Regions:
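Short, charged phosphate-coordinating catalytic segments
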Residues: 98-107, 158-179
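N-terminal helical hairpins
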Residues: 1-10
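Short, basic (Lys/Arg/His-rich) helix/loop patches that form interaction surfaces
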Residues: 144-146, 240-263
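DNA breakage-rejoining catalytic core of tyrosine-based enzymes
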Residues: 56, 120-139, 191-198, 213-216
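Basic, Lys/Arg- and aromatic-enriched nucleic-acid-binding interface segment
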Residues: 113-166
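C-terminal catalytic core of Y-nucleophile DNA break-rejoin enzymes
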Residues: 189-207, 214-245
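N-terminal core-binding DNA-recognition domain of tyrosine recombinases/integrases
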Residues: 17-30, 40-125, 140-143
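Short, basic/aromatic-rich helical patch in the C-terminal catalytic core of site-specific tyrosine
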Residues: 63, 93, 169, 258-264
């Protein structure tokens, strides 16, 4: 892709679009999505200037004004962002800046324009269900709503599988099972893992087995009327939507999600 330049510096918009496309080609859709979100936020700040803003315009002074804009809720148009959200936008912008500089062998200042930006993010409190709530879930009568039922079974599976992350469960196939163990590669780290299949897990797996269907949880890959392409993220949103309703009906003190079950 040929990048247009202004004063010998490439346009930031085109650099970032190229970077996002490369991540999609590499199969790193989640990273591409993070980059897209960070760029969309910066584009909103730039407004009409976005078409002429160059790589070298990303200075320390500019970034301080951008951060202030984010902290003030886009000049009062939105609610002020929490530290975690501020960190997300700045961190991904910094990653893109460094990646573009490396790939295009750009001349950059000795001191990074991001060096003075420090966002203190408070540690995330681990969310977990109390043991009594877990016992109630395990003995809960099968929900009449089929989508709520599959969401409950999936949540219990995450718990029995020692906190396996949703993306890895989404990708599980029956070919991953061997000698009462599930063998898989953790998507986040690339590390090979194995999990002993408990009797509870075996019952859940068996109940969703479909002839000539490779997926352990085929319902996660089924397209729902009115929804777009099924991805791990869209399936996760669907499952969490039903879990949250279930948690409200059971009067849980916190929102009931797959994240909560993984850390219980």
């Amino acid at each position: 892709m040929n990048i247009e330049t202004t004063d010998n510096s490439p346009l930031l918009q085109e650099c970032i679009e190229e970077l996002i496309s490369s991540k999609i080609d590499e199969g790193k859709g989640r990273t591409a999505g993070n980059y897209r979100s960070a760029w969309n936020k910066l584009s909103t700040f730039l407004g009409p200037r976005v078409t002429e803003f160059t790589f070298v315009d990303l200075t320390t002074d500019f970034l301080h004004h951008y951060l202030l804009w984010l902290m003030q809720g886009e000049d009062g148009k939105q609610a002020p962002l929490k530290p975690g959200s501020l960190d997300f936008y700045i961190r991904n912008l910094k990653t893109m800046y460094n990646k573009i500089a490396q790939d295009k062998q750009m001349d950059v200042p000795r001191e990074s324009p991001f060096s003075g930006l420090q966002i203190k993010v408070p540690p995330t409190r681990k969310r977990a269900l109390p043991s009594l709530d877990l016992q109630n879930l395990a003995t809960l009568e099968r929900p009449k709503n089929p989508h709520a039922c599959t969401a409950l079974h999936l949540a219990l599976f995450l718990f029995y599988a020692r906190g396996m992350c949703f993306v890895d469960v989404f990708n599980l196939r029956h070919s991953n099972i061997n000698d009462d163990y599930i063998h898989y590669v953790r998507s986040k780290t690339g590390v090979a893992m194995q999990v002993k299949i408990t009797p509870e897990m075996k019952n859940i797996i068996f109940s969703y087995r479909r002839f000539n269907n490779p997926w352990i949880f085929p319902f996660l890959h089924e397209k729902i009327s009115g929804e777009g392409e099924v991805t791990a993220q869209s399936a996760l949103r669907r499952v969490n939507r039903h879990l949250k309703k279930m948690g409200e009906q059971l009067h849980f003190e916190q929102p009931f999600t797959t994240y909560v079950m993984r850390h219980s």
